[in-house]
Structure formats: C-alpha cells, structure tokens
Amino acid sequence: MKQPRGISLNPKLGQMLLIGLPTLAYITALLFDSSRTVVLWERSAPPAAPLALLATGLALHSAVALALLARLPRTLSSKQAAALLAYVFVAGVALQTAATHIVEPFPLRGLAFRQYSDFTGGYFTVGVRVDDLWGWLARFSQEMESYNVHAERHPPGLPMIFWLGVQLLRPFPELAAALEPTLRPLACFDLRPGELDAVQLAAGLFGILIETIAAWSVPILLFVFVQRLAGDRAAAMAALLYPLIPGALMWASQWDRSFGLFSLATLILVEAMLAAPVRPRGFAAAFFAGLVLFLGTLMSFGNLPIAMIGGLYALARIWALEQLRLWPVRLAQGVLAFIGLAGPWAALVLLAGFDLRGSYETAMRLHLALERDYWPFVLWHPWDIFTFAGLPLAMIATCLTWQRAPALTFAWVATLAAQSLLHVARGETGRVWMYFAPVIVALGSLWLTRREGAIRFAQLSFVIGLLTAQAAAHIGLLRVIGYGADPITVPRPTLPANLVSTEIRFEPNGEIRLLGYVIKQTFRPGESGTIDLYWRHEGETFLPRARKVFIHVTDTLEDRERIVNQDGRPANWTLPTTCWLPGQVIHDRHIFTVAGDAQPGEYYVLIGLYDELTGERAFVHTAQVAVANAVALPSRFVVASLNRE
C-alpha cells in the first residue's frame, strides 16, 4: 500500500533560498526601510552617475569572472596564475575607486583627505610626529589618551608604518619638495598641516600606497590558501569573488581591510606545519605563524581573535588527520608559535621600555567605554560582518560548508560566536572584523567547487548575481566614512539681503574676516535658534591652524553669565579653517538653545575662534568691541518674557 507523500523541498532549492533570501531582504531594507532595524549604518541617496559607474564596473567584473572560470584549465601555469592575480589586483583598485566616487567627487583627493584626517584614518596624525622611535615607544602608553579617537585605541604598529615612510623619504628631499604643493592642501584635515614638513607630507602618500597594496594583496594570499585546500579552480574563484564583497571596496584608506592578510598567512602556515610535522620546515612554519600574529596584534589589539581562528583550525585539522597521535610534536609546535607571538612583544618591553600592559588596558578601557546594548548587538555583530563580507557567501560559510570544510567552518564560526557573546566589540564590526572576510570567501569558493575540481556554475552564477546586486545597493546607500567636505566642491554662498555686514577680522594679519551674520533679534527662554556666519579667507596661502567657532550670549562683556554657549568646527563640522581656500566664502550655520532660566532683557553676542587642539583663542585683528579675543557683534540679543504675547 502506497504511503502518502509529504511535502518535501528540493535540497538545491532549499540551498538557494538560504543563500538568496537574506540578501534580498537586506537589499529591500536598504531601499525601503528607513529605520535601523536591519541596517546599522547611516544612509544617503547616491549620485546617479557614480552609482551607474560602480554598477557597471561590478557587472563587468562579474562577467569577466564567469568567463574566466568557464575556460580555466584544472591546473594553472605560473604565468596564468600571475596574470589572473594581476587582473584581480587591478580590478580591485578600479572598483575601489568607483566605490569611493560615490561619496567623493574626486576619489584620489578623497583618499588623501581620509589618510591625513584626524577623524578617519587617524594614525597619520601620530605617525608623522614620531622622530625618536625608541623614546616614543617608551612613552606610548602615557600619551595614548592624547591621540585622536582611532590612534588612542590601538598599539603602535600603524603609526610605525608612517614613521617608516618618513625614514624612507628623508634621503629624497627633492622628491618630497616636488610633492609638497600638491599634498599640503590635501593634508588640511590633519588640523595642523602647517607643522608638517615636506617629507612628513610625502609619508602620507606612502601610507596611501601601502594601505592600497596591502588591501589588494589579500586576494593573492587567498588564492594561495585555497589552492592548498582545493586546487587552482577553487583558488581562482576565491580571488575573483573577493572584489565583489562590499567591505573590500568601501573602506578605502582604512587599514582594517588589509588585516585579512594576517588571517590568511596564519592559516597557510598552519597548513605548512601540518604537512611537515617532524621536519624542520614544520617547526619553522609554527614559529612564523606566531610571528604573523605578533605583527597583526602590533597593528591592532582587535586582531587577537585571529589567533583563535588559527588555533581552532589547527586543532580540528590535527584531530581529523592524526587523532593526536603526534601530540608531543604538535605541542612543541604550539610552543614555537607562542614564542613567535610573545617573543617580539617581550623584546619591545625589555629593549624599548614599551608598556604593553598599560597600552592594552588603555586601549580596551577607551574601547569598552562605548556603550552598546548587549542582546541586540549579539546579533548585530555577526550580521554586520555578514553584510560587509557579502551575505550570499556568509550564509554559505555559516550553514553549508560543515561537510566540505569542517575544520575551517568550525574555526571561524566558533570565533565569531565567542566574539559576539563576549561583547568585546562595540559596533562597526563590519569594519573591524574584516579579517573574517577572506575566510568567508574561501569557504564560499570551496562549496561552489566540487571535490573533483568541477565548478557548480548554476550556483556560482546565482551567488555572483546576488553579490553584485548587494554590493551596488550597499556601497551606493551606506555612509560609513565622514571627515568633512572637499573645499573645492563647496558652493559659493549667496549673501542674504538681511546680512548684518561687519569688518571683524581674526589672526595676526587679519586673514579670517567675518563678512557678516544673520540672526533674529528676539528669543524666549528655552527656544532654539540659528546664527548664520559668513566668513572669507583673505590670506594668500592656507591657514596653518584649525579653529573652532564659539558663540556666547552673555549679560556683560566680561562673559560671566551665559544663556547660550555653542561652539563647533565651521560649516557643521565639515570644513576646518585649515581647508579654506584663499578668497573662499564660507557659510557657517550654528544651532543653539537659549537657557530655560534666561531672564528677560538685552544680551551681548560674543563670537571668536580658538585652536581646536590647545583651546587658545585666535588674535582679534579688527573689531569695534573686543574682550579677551572675543568680539561683540553690533546686534543685541533680546530675551522676551514667556508671558509676553
């Protein structure tokens, strides 16, 4: 007697739904859900032409990848492999430039602004001022909290890259001098560009080149790693898929993109160690794996989990291969790996006086001070890196590779779970966990390649289509880096008819002039309002110091009792004075709120400029009434009674 058939789902269809539905849901949320339910980051409508350029570039690369993979032999010659990796490198840089163009009218200028900025890369500001390396290392932990928001939470490795750039360029002062006219205006977001010499400025260009080269060397190591596991076709697929993941394209100038090098180098060395358990090269591989982890943690303490990925992968592979039959050998290799990691740190402590414990405690204290709700972020943390590593590949690497690559799947999933549950991250995991991305891509390529080397082209085409769509929407809409505005793109404002004109000037030679302002005359206690200032840079060269604007509304010229106290970087924090162009007019709006207990009457409006870093006020060159380098505006600020109709 026939049994009634139940409803069954075709396994391939189930896999496609698992891979595709999260991506489609995410793209839908990006486009139509303005809340942050599924999308953590801020969003903005992209300009049409740059978005079309990016989408075209992604589609072209996808087509090239499919065409190449359809024609690749099972085994590549060294020339074929080199040509393929050269293409991936060039395609990656080109796609990165197109992605940067979404938010930067001039992408190369934008990369420079990011590199020098206190608000983004952040490391340049520290690195260029390191003259005595050993002395700086000795006092590093004491100075960390005086650094900007990024450098204060990291070990000294990244500033040392810029120190290296300075040392390499010192013997070539003519080259640095030739670059200076181009680079100095691009360093204006450093806030103190006037204090940088030509060689230090050129070191910023060195940093841009090194970061870009390092970021697009990741698919090269990815090829090497996957080649060891599954052959040339899977390796080629992994390298070709990597430029389609959003995080590799939109974090230009952020060193986190390159931290996947440490993940891959560790895994490659683990494989080398396993392949030669009792030979010298196996022990050497273990030591160098530890050394790679040292370099990774020297760049960022946040790279410590790479040790967990490598350790769990090694243990799982050893168990599968040997069931611990060679445990004394493996224990010795583990000791060598620990020496490779801890030995250089010990040398820095003993020889340079570096305070490792103090630096780590300071970095973690500042990092963990960022408040994030626990349970929402237990889910947000993995979701964020899933979206930046490409949702189709992340779903494959999490759910579908347990049979194809159990050790690697276990290593990365367990590390991800531990990171999320321990709550050591504080948001932005799509950036700071980019060391997971090449592992995710590797697992995706392993699943898309059969054990005998054949490629699953139907699934591959589906995955590439999803990746292309997600990358275009994700990069086009999300806004993850903000440092300010390119001064040459700032429109010249039209002076309003109700402008109150002034002859107020600041700086020793009157380089900064307040052309005028607009403010309404009467306010009530607790009321919010705006004051629009119109500045002009009347000097002939760039301004050497970044100034903030302060606005005080006070009962006396001595500035004792304030009912308004507002300050900020000009143009809504987007344009420090160091970026103002000679002759440029700046519209600078400030929003304020009158104190709720303000008494009715007339008040003075005092304005001025002060150094962002020291707090010292700028010299008042011209003003009718000035007290303590603050200028009283001609208009009076009137607070009306709350009972007044």
Residue ranges and their predicted role:
Residues P243-M250, G282-F301, A307-G311:
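Membrane-interface alpha helices of multi-pass inner-membrane proteins
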Residues M1-L21, P47-Q115, Q333-A337:
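Start-transfer (signal-anchor) and selected internal transmembrane alpha helices
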Residues I488-E645:
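C-terminal luminal/periplasmic domains and tails of membrane-associated envelope-modifying transferases
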Residues I7-L13, V278-R281, L321-A332, A397-V413:
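Membrane-interface helix-loop-helix junctions at transmembrane boundaries of multi-pass membrane enzymes
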Residues A63-R71, F386-S420, A442:
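Hydrophobic, aromatic-rich transmembrane alpha-helices
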Residues L175, T182-L244:
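Transmembrane-helix signature of polytopic, membrane-embedded enzymes
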Residues G247, W251-F259:
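Short acidic/glycine- and proline-prone juxtamembrane loop motifs at membrane-interface regions
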Residues P22-T37, L295, I309-L312, A316-C399:
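Membrane-lumen/periplasm interface segments of specific transmembrane helices
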